[in-house]
């Protein structure tokens, strides 16, 4: 009987985590996908692709500072937590191989 509360807690955590990822994807599509496209490919050279190396850029303080100044980011109606979730979504969805090992 003690397993039931643990199982319920695990299910609740999984659902909450899934909602967070879904929200980040929706926010990406609403605030970034119009220019960078749903698959992150962008429209080079005007709109850079998010595929490939941006994970290396986000690892640098200057890269994160630049990312915060992109018009869709700096003018988005997202709070800091939602914005961080969108950036994390973009990095893991489009750049998993280029991310630093300690990326969370």
Per-region residue spans from a language model:
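Flexible coil segments in periplasmic/lumen-exposed cytochrome c-class electron-transfer proteins
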Residues: 81, 92-104
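Bacterial N-terminal signal peptides
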Residues: 5-15
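Gly/Gly-Pro-rich "capping" loops immediately C-terminal to redox-active cysteine motifs
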Residues: 41-76
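Sequence/structural segment immediately N-terminal to covalent heme-attachment motifs in c-type
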Residues: 19-41, 59
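N-terminal secretory signal peptides that target proteins for export/translocation
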Residues: 1-2
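Structured segments of extracytoplasmic/periplasmic soluble domains
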Residues: 31-34, 38, 53, 66-73, ...
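An amphipathic alpha-helix signature
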Residues: 60, 64, 68, 80-91
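Short coil/turn linker and secondary-structure boundary residues
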Residues: 16-19, 58, 78, 101-104
